[in-house]
């Protein structure tokens, strides 16, 4: 459960990300594909090379979904319901991949915003991403 401080930290972090969400999302995906090559199996139709237009487009989708979630912290299940259905029933993404992408996103954010990426912000973002992953996998059962 996100505390009031966590919610404040998450909102502040996403405000700081601003117009860089797509860029950071793509970078996190690239980092995931390089660090965890098995994740590429979910994107057989993608060019997963550095700078790929498909990776950039999907990175923007990921960032936009997370920005939407960050603006609906008190109602994540409803805010993410359609994405949960998509990932559980159509795409059938292994839930562990959400954790891998979350880790890569945290690394990306830490690289771009080291001064703002305090231990408290790191913990809040980690809890937020874990909560998002839990919601996205809630319809797998």
Curated annotation (Swiss-Prot):
On this chain, the residues bearing N6-acetyllysine are: 16
Tell me the disulfide pairings in this chain. Answer: none
> Which residues are involved in binding O2?
58
Q: In which tissues is it expressed?
A: Red blood cells.
Q: At which residues is Phosphotyrosine found?
A: 24
Task: Say if the entry is tagged with keyword Transferase.
Answer: no
Residues that bear Phosphothreonine: 8, 108, 134, 137
PTM-bearing positions, type Phosphoserine: 3, 35, 49, 102, 124, 138
Q: Which GO terms describe its molecular function?
A: haptoglobin binding; heme binding; iron ion binding; organic acid binding; oxygen binding; oxygen carrier activity; peroxidase activity
**GO CC, any one term:** hemoglobin complex
Relate the assembly described in the record.
Heterotetramer of two alpha chains and two beta chains.
Q: Per its record, how is this protein called by name?
A: Hemoglobin subunit alpha
Q: Which species is the source of this protein?
A: Ctenodactylus gundi (Northern gundi)
